[in-house]
């Protein structure tokens, strides 16, 4: 784990200081899901997942409720998801995932950030062969949880990989977690299987996983991280997936 864990830990520690930017982005996803599939989370799986992920980031209930209500407003923005393929220095490639009500504004902002920081926007779909979309679920590792047994139980629902990890906490006490991966088309089946087993999922996402990760030294990593920070500072950017190992 080593360096990879420390890198993730540093990134998470930094995010704790930027919740004022994170909550509006989470709210946008909740509003979009509610507008698409209805305001009732029990009848709208996408909204249910958006709320789950917002709670995982400690988004207050009042903020979540307000985001849902915005979807019912007559003047509710028509928010759409869009992704951009990006090339950066040192062989780094990125999928930049956005949620926006103004594509012209978003593409202009992303291009400006890339142009100022050595990045380049590629033709849409250029990196399809470099990444694979996966369903990813994260939940707490309990003392009585048998991962081998759980793996066997979930294979029929699309599970491809299961791993144990530790998640940094603000109080410094790292927490044992389990992360599972499956085909993105199995997202619903895996979600239902975990629910049926009484496992409380902390985070459920569709992620772009690099097929051939690249290694960077510390200086290169700092430079790319600075670019990622600038992209994530944009109000429309939801996620930045990279091929960094």
From Swiss-Prot:
Keywords: Cytoplasm, DNA-binding, Transcription, Transcription regulation
Transcription regulation in keyword set: yes
Compartments in which it is found: Cytoplasm
Pfam families the record matches: TACO1_YebC_N, Transcrip_reg
GO BP: any one term: regulation of DNA-templated transcription
KW DNA-binding (keyword) present: yes
Gene Ontology CC terms, in alphabetical order: cytosol
One MF term in the entry's GO annotations: DNA binding
Disulphide bonds in the chain: none
Top-level taxonomic group: Bacteria
Stated family: Belongs to the TACO1 family.
Protein name listed in UniProt: Probable transcriptional regulatory protein SUN_1622
């Amino acid at each position: 784990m080593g360096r990879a864990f420390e890198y993730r830990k540093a990134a998470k520690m930094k995010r704790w200081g930027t919740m004022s930017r994170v909550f509006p982005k989470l709210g946008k996803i909740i509003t979009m899901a509610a507008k698409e599939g209805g305001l009732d989370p029990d009848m709208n799986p996408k909204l249910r997942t958006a709320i789950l992920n917002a709670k995982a980031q400690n988004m207050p209930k009042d903020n979540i409720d307000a985001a849902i209500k915005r979807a019912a407003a007559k003047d509710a923005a028509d928010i759409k998801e869009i992704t951009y393929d990006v090339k950066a220095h040192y062989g780094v490639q990125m999928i930049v995932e956005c949620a926006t009500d103004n594509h012209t504004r978003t593409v202009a902002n992303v291009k400006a950030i890339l142009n100022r920081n050595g990045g380049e926007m590629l033709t849409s779909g250029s990196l399809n062969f470099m990444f694979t979309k996966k369903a990813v679920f994260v939940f707490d590792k309990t003392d009585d949880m048998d991962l081998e047994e759980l793996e066997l139980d979930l294979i029929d629902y699309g599970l491809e990989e299961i791993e144990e990890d530790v998640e940094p906490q603000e109080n410094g006490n790292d927490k044992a977690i389990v992360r599972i991966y499956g085909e993105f088309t199995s997202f619903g089946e895996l979600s239902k299987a975990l629910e049926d087993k009484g496992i409380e999922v902390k985070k459920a996402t569709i992620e772009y996983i690099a097929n051939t990760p690249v290694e960077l030294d510390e200086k290169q990593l700092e430079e790319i991280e600075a670019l990622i920070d600038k992209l994530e500072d944009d109000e429309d950017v939801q996620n930045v997936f990279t091929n960094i190992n």
